[in-house]
Amino acid sequence: MLLRLKMNYYIKTQKLVESFGFKIVSKDFQRPWGGFLVIDENQAQNFSNHFFKGINIEDLKISGKLSPKILIVKPDSRLSWQYHHRRAEIWRVFKGKVGIIKSEDDTENEMKAYSEGDQITLTQGERHRLIGLDDYGVVAEIWQHTDKNNPSDEEDIVRVQDDFGR
């Protein structure tokens, strides 16, 4: 029953994102903390228009392309305490409330709560953790690749701490 409710939330979120005209090129609803939708990179400006109040993607580019994504975090779940070598990120809370911890080093600071519409920027190498609070949280994110010749991918995650032993 719980698995069905979880999958229903993911499918409902996927259909909502598709109803905005976005093409989902891949998805993963099997992460221990929730799941994600990867949006066609050619739709980065439309994604920014919809979720980031129309920030011009040229202003977001650091080195090369941008990669839009939707994160869905389960209640009472946490992504790993992590950072990236080849990307910065910009996030906007789309649905619900989430907790976020950020730090310039491996020390976890206090969690701050964010609500729908709040925007968060993460620099390359900045430690961060997304936390699901009392309900599902949905976050729109754009990867800002920092290495034009070697764009970031799902392997570009340095996990400092992980609740799931990864």
Please state what every model-predicted region is:
Residues 66, 86, 124-126:
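Short, surface-exposed coil-to-beta transition loops
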Residues 104-125:
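Short acidic-glycine-tyrosine-enriched beta hairpin
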Residues 68-72, 90, 111, 119-121:
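Conserved hydrophobic/aromatic beta-strand scaffold that supports enzyme active sites
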Residues 129-166:
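Double-stranded beta-helix
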Residues 69, 78-81:
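Short, charged beta-strand/loop "edge" motif centered at a coil->beta-strand transition
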Residues 75, 85-105:
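Glycine- and acidic-residue-biased ligand/ion/polar-headgroup-sensing regions
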Residues 1-66, 157-166:
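A short, N-terminal "cap"/entry segment at the start of jelly-roll beta-barrel domains
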Residues 80-82, 91, 100-102, 121-122, ...:
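Short beta-strand His + acidic residue motifs that chelate non-heme Fe in jelly-roll/DSBH
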